[in-house]
Amino acid sequence: MKKFVAIAGNIGVGKSTLVKMLCDQMGWDPFYEPVTENPYLADFYQNMSAWAFHSQVFFLAHRLRSHFGLAQNPNSVIQDRSVYEDAEIFANNLYQQGNIQDRDYKTYRELYETAVQFLPPPDLVIYLRASVPTLLNRINSRGRDYERKIAPEYLKNLNDLYESWIENFTLCPVLAVPADDLDYVAHSGHLRLIVKKVDDKLTGKEEVVFEPEEMARAAED
């Protein structure tokens, strides 16, 4: 039976890497964040408060279209970043920073919440949870120049929004992965453990956690 899984998490946590590795293991199709030419982006960086709303609506429209297409795809797919994160994390963060006005944010939320009602949810959201030091370490390791200026405070704000969102998310099951403790690139055992937990959630097991003892054993593989 076809499955639709989305991987969520902060900048630098390792979403794209896990998408590829899980798809290689499970024989599923990966779907990465599309490189989309946002016509508002240059204006946004010049004047965030004037163009944040327009930019976020553009991104939301593309993310909604991608989500709907993946839900209709006959093959099992794993998505790099969900539609929910656009609204619940990034647009919310811009609003909290004062870059989206109250009435614009209310309109954005109404648009998002109405659209989401008509979207079939994923079968599972995998949430990669990591501390700011882990995020910074991974960001530095991958060496993208445009990410080197990301402040720890910005990552912390996003982490706080992620935790609030995932705690209240009820549209589909969630598997929280302790990314501080699991290095699925360095340890094949960690990857196999994640695959097992994903299978557990997709087959209906409700309480799926990563026990310290099994993570330690998996690191030895």
Where are these regions (language model features)?
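A glycine- and Lys/Arg-enriched "phosphate-lid" helix/loop adjacent to the NTP-binding pocket
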Residues: I89-E163
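Conserved lysine of the Walker
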Residues: K15
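Pre-Walker A (Motif I) flank of P-loop NTPase domains
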Residues: M1-F4, P74
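Hydrophobic anchor at the beta1->P-loop junction of P-loop NTPases
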Residues: I7
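Conserved substrate/cofactor phosphate-moiety recognition/catalytic segment
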Residues: D24-H62
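NTP-dependent small-molecule kinase module
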Residues: N137-K149, E153-D221
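P-loop (Walker A) phosphate-binding loop of NTP-binding proteins
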Residues: N10
